[in-house]
Regions:
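Alpha/beta catalytic cores of group-transfer enzymes, especially the acyltransferase/condensing modules
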Residues: 22-24, 50, 111-186
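Conserved short-loop catalytic and cofactor-binding motifs
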Residues: 30-31, 68-71, 107, 140-143, ...
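Gly/Ala-rich beta-loop-alpha elbow adjacent to hydrolase catalytic centers
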Residues: 80, 95, 99-103, 107, ...
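Short, electropositive, low-hydrophobicity segments enriched in small/polar residues
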Residues: 24-27, 32, 55, 103, ...
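Residues within well-formed alpha-helices
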Residues: 45, 79, 83, 105-106, ...
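A general structural motif at alpha-helix termini
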Residues: 61-62, 101, 123-126
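An amphipathic alpha-helix/helix-turn recognition signal
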Residues: 41, 75, 101-102, 114, ...
Length: 186
């Protein structure tokens, strides 16, 4: 449950909300927040847009079902927006809102750049297109930790063995995500 004590701004820049991308989902996420009216309202809005009970999905889906991009994205987007709405209803206002990958859409909703319904509609199309692309062109990704670009590029060339294997995301110093065919990523 959210602590009802207001948070003090963190230094001169203030508080920043960050919405995560796909991959951070897990069954039961948000369970301790579902009694909050803002959370229920946000999940109800998402359910209306997606055409299924997004709260039930987030709370009760088996990991394999929740990890399907058509399910992970709606659940994560709804939860990210819901948490922000609950905090803001309690006087916690962000100085900035950021998002990583899928979280960029949640950040647009939280910042007021998109209505929640518009953001969820965008997530619906995004998740469907990504699922179609993945089915047509199976691929895999893996994050490499304590990695540098030169060694990752060399590793990709060495391990590709005729398949596709490339550095795809330079997340932060020391973390590089590689992507390619499932066999090459293995």
């Amino acid at each position: 449950m959210l602590d009802e004590t207001p948070l003090a701004p963190l230094g001169p820049a203030g508080l920043v909300f960050m919405a995560s991308g796909q991959g951070s989902q897990k069954p039961g996420m948000g369970a301790d927040l579902m009694d909050l009216p803002e959370v229920r309202e946000t999940f109800a809005c998402a359910s209306d847009v997606f055409g299924f009970d997004v709260a039930d999905l987030a709370l009760n889906a088996e990991p394999e079902k929740l990890n399907d991009t058509r399910n992970a994205q709606p659940a994560l987007a709804a939860l990210s927006v819901a948490v922000a709405r609950a905090l803001m209803a309690r006087g916690v206002e962000p100085a900035a809102v950021l998002g990583f990958s899928l979280g960029q859409i949640s950040a647009l909703a939280v910042s007021g750049m998109l209505a929640d319904e518009e953001a969820f509609a965008l997530v619906k199309v995004r998740s469907e297109l990504m699922a179609e692309a993945a089915a047509a062109h199976p691929g895999a990704m893996s994050a490499l930790l304590k990695a540098d670009e030169e060694n990752v590029r060399a590793l990709c060339e060495e391990c590709a063995e005729g398949d596709v294997l490339v550095p795809a995301n330079f997340n932060c110093p020391g973390q590089i995500v590689v992507a390619g065919t499932p066999a090459a990523v293995e």
